[in-house]
């Protein structure tokens, strides 16, 4: 769910309850982002802040990961376990990969296949938009 979006940033929320099989869910779809005032399309997202909760299970499987989508194998941005808040704005955010391979530049929420059924994952993330 997009909570707020403008030319500079987008804030996205996702709530995922595991069914025990693992999942990859598109979290930040750059092709669905609004164009800026000059008509340019968003090409990449830079993680600025994240609020998260990865709870439930026996403790060994209650984690999630944000990845940048790539046909050659997804590129991890950050791992999330427990609950908390991180602010990366002081140094410009966690930049995603912008190499010349087959990046699609979408950001995915990945829940491991070892997750117990009913584990809950909530992530609210603020991204800077790059054009």
Segments and roles (model prediction):
Residues 1-39:
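Solvent-exposed, flexible loop/coil segments flanking beta-strands in beta-rich domains
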Residues 1-8, 112-131:
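C-terminal interaction-tip segments
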Residues 4-6, 41-46, 101-103, 117:
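Solvent-exposed loop and beta-edge segments used for protein-protein assembly and interaction
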Residues 28-65:
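Beta-rich globular "head" domains
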Residues 51-53, 110, 126:
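Residue-level recognition of well-ordered beta-strand positions that form the cores
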Residues 56-80:
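Short, surface-exposed beta-strand/strand-loop-strand elements in extracellular ectodomains
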Residues 73-95:
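An anionic, turn-rich surface loop/hairpin at beta-sheet edges
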Residues 92-121:
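Noncatalytic modules at the cell exterior or secretory-pathway interfaces
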């Amino acid at each position: 769910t997009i909570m707020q979006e403008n030319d500079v940033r987008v804030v996205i929320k996702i709530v995922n309850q595991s069914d025990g099989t693992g999942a990859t869910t598109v979290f930040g779809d750059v092709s669905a982002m609004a164009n800026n005032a000059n008509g340019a399309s968003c090409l990449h997202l830079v993680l600025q802040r994240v609020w998260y909760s990865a709870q439930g299970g026996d403790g060994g499987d209650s984690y999630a990961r944000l990845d940048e989508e790539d046909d050659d194998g997804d590129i991890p941005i950050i791992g999330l376990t427990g609950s908390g808040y991180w602010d990366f704005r002081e140094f410009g955010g966690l930049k995603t990969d912008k190499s010349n391979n087959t990046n699609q530049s979408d950001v995915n929420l990945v829940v491991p296949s070892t997750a117990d059924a009913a584990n809950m994952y909530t992530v609210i993330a603020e991204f800077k938009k790059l054009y």
